[in-house]
Amino acid sequence: DEAGRPVLSGAVGYISVSHTDGYALLAYSLSNPVGVDMEHVDRNVSAAARRFLNESCLSAVPASERDIYMLASWCACEALFKLVGNIGGTYKDNVIVKPFLSGTHGTIDVSINGISPTYDCDLEAMYVNDGELFMLLVEAK
């Protein structure tokens, strides 16, 4: 489409695609727009964190959980971009990833800080961490 997102030509539904070193991830939803991202669990995103991570959220995360929180936040920003397109501001100031208890799978509270009037909807973020890959799906509800 005009925002660079993949579309299903002549078909019903929404798709999103991600890839990283030897892996690919495809999400399909019949009814709701989706965005996905995946990264290797051992990827160090701390150097880039200052560009995409809200400092107040990071400070609320225990030190032992910060690496996975930073990776989840990175994946959430990437997935949101694939879902929404240009949010009209910076991720650091406008994407909120609330601290969460990490495990092998679960949900994460993700929100866009009111700057995308065309995307004033509920977002649901689900993740899987298989020990090698961290995969995150954001769906508009």
Would you name each region that the model predicts?
Residues 1-141:
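Core catalytic alpha/beta fold that binds nucleotide/phospho-ligands
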